[in-house]
């Protein structure tokens, strides 16, 4: 059994027991989160595809941790002008473990 749900503007394909990094959620570590924007649920031969969402579909997950991703370096450079700028960015994320998929 697996599902595709939407969180933080991105789509994630998950199955029970999977651990996924999502955009930062303002939820305490150890608490339970329910995602109701489910786009697809597949259970063996039965596949429920939403138009655009599956009615009554829900993905339940437990928050494992919060953190920051790898540093992304941005370099801006103007040729022949002795001008360059270097910036860095680390995106916050929330790591969740999928506990159940409800159709």
Curated annotation (Swiss-Prot):
One of its GO terms (molecular function) is rRNA binding. GO terms for cellular component: cytoplasm; ribonucleoprotein complex; ribosome. One of its GO terms (biological process) is translation. PROSITE patterns: RIBOSOMAL_L21. Disulfide bonds: none annotated. Keywords: Ribonucleoprotein, Ribosomal protein, RNA-binding, rRNA-binding. This protein binds to 23S rRNA in the presence of protein L20. Part of the 50S ribosomal subunit. Contacts protein L20. NCBIfam families: L21 (TIGR00061). Belongs to the bacterial ribosomal protein bL21 family. This is Large ribosomal subunit protein bL21. It comes from Shewanella oneidensis (strain ATCC 700550 / JCM 31522 / CIP 106686 / LMG 19005 / NCIMB 14063 / MR-1). The lineage of its organism: Bacteria, Pseudomonadati, Pseudomonadota, Gammaproteobacteria, Alteromonadales.
């Amino acid at each position: 059994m697996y599902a595709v749900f939407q969180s933080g503007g991105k789509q994630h394909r998950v199955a029970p027991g999977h651990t996924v990094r999502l955009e930062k959620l303002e939820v305490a570590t150890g608490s339970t989160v329910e995602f109701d924007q489910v786009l697809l649920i597949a259970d063996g031969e039965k596949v429920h595809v939403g138009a655009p969402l599956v009615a009554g579909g829900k993905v339940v997950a437990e928050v494992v941790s919060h953190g920051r991703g790898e540093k992304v370096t941005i370099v801006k450079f103007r040729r022949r002008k002795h001008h360059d700028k270097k910036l860095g960015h680390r995106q916050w994320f929330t790591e969740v473990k999928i506990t159940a998929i409800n159709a």
